[in-house]
Amino acid sequence: MHRPPLAAVLVVAAALLTGCASGDDWSQRRPSPSAVGALGAGFTAPGRSPAPESTLTPSPGSWSGVRPSPGFRVVLLSAGGDRPAKTLAKAVKEWAKDADVDLRTVTASGDADLLPAVTRAMEMHPDLIVSAGNDLIDPLTTVSPSHLAQEFLVVGAELAEPTENVTAVDWSGASFRGEGLGMSSTYDPASFTDARCAAAIRAGAAAVLTGHTGIVVWLDEF
């Protein structure tokens, strides 16, 4: 039986190992991520940046010209098997594919795993953690103020008192703020449509990438 030379086998093996490492290892140093493109008219008021904890109502589609630079590292942190949470997670995955984002996922296995899941996501040191699922709001409220260097994007819910590292995207029907806290609108699972969730992750990511953090992006129109 013919066997390839040992040297050839070693070259192929080294190439395979190198390829796997370059795509999977987040410990590798690389340039800081940045926004590619610019926000359109109407995302913010002309000449003014939104104040911390304020609510921003962008013009529909004004975020569409912004995408992350190649290699942007994102963790999708999800919890809950309800349709809104699943629709949000699907939208994040589709955005990541379209934008060439390096996406990893952390899914909480139950109530007892909510806080550990947040910790696991942070230990990966991504550029951004995107949260999908109302069950994660209370754990994020506990953890995020102590980790200001980590950016969070909450989609379809919000924190009652966010720090500058927590940005949220909300709309009428999706403004859960934590157990026992009032909401700015009546919760409506039907408002979590594919189109709205797709717009929400894109608008929220554009806000974070352009430095508009610690705010709520209100997305009744998209």
Feature map (PLM): residue ranges:
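Sec-dependent bacterial lipoprotein signal peptides
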Residues: M1-T18
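Bacterial signal peptide processing site
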Residues: C20-D24
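Short, well-structured alpha-helical segments in soluble
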Residues: D113-H125
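Solvent-exposed loop/turn segments at secondary-structure junctions
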Residues: G80-R83, N134-D138, A157-E161, F222
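Ser/Thr/Gly-rich flexible loops in soluble cytosolic domains mediating phosphotransfer, phosphorylation
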Residues: Q150-C197
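An alpha-beta-alpha
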Residues: L181-F222
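Extracytoplasmic low-complexity, Pro/Thr/Ser/Ala/Gly-rich segments
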Residues: D25-A112
